[in-house]
């Protein structure tokens, strides 16, 4: 339960964002925190999408897992890069 800074980029956008997330946030919550900076601003919403998915080093993460749970499985430094995209 502590703030953790990440860099999030929505796939298709050219602007990465510094996003403060909590280690108790789920991956789905992190996706929303990143997407809010892009979807509806520089990219239109996708009406066929069922939500968002988060990629870390090209691997899709489980949306229900917390950041803390992911951090126990792999080394993660502040300002870690996360990609977010529409889930089809």
Curated annotation (Swiss-Prot):
Broad EC category: oxidoreductase
Q: How is its activity regulated?
A: Inhibited by propyne.
Instruction: Please indicate if the UniProt record lists Oxidoreductase as a keyword.
Output: yes
> Per its UniProt record, what InterPro entries does this chain match?
TmoB-like_sf (IPR036713), Toluene_mOase_B (IPR009355)
Q: Which GO terms describe its cellular component?
A: cytoplasm
Q: Where is the signal peptide?
A: none
Keyword line: Cytoplasm, Monooxygenase, NAD, Oxidoreductase, Plasmid
Describe what upregulates or represses it.
Induced during growth on aliphatic alkenes (such as propylene, ethylene and 1-butylene), epoxides (such as propylene oxide and 1,2-epoxybutane) and chlorinated alkenes and epoxides (such as vinyl chloride, cis- and trans-1,2-dichloroethylene, 1-chloropropylene, 1,3-dichloropropylene, epichlorohydrin, and epifluorohydrin). Repressed during growth on other carbon sources.
Query: What are the GO MF terms of this UniProt record?
Result: alkene monooxygenase activity
Keyword field contains NAD: yes
Task: State which Enzyme Commission number(s) the record gives.
Answer: 1.14.13.69
Query: What exactly does this protein do?
Result: Component of the alkene monooxygenase multicomponent enzyme system which catalyzes the O2- and NADH-dependent epoxidation of short chain (C2 to C6) alkenes to their corresponding epoxides. Also able to catalyze the oxidation of a number of chlorinated alkenes, including trichloroethylene, cis- and trans-1,2-dichloroethylene, vinyl chloride, 1-chloropropylene, 1,3-dichloropropylene and 2,3-dichloropropylene.
> Into which family does the record put it?
Belongs to the TmoB/XamoB family.
Protein's UniProt name: Alkene monooxygenase system, oxygenase component subunit gamma
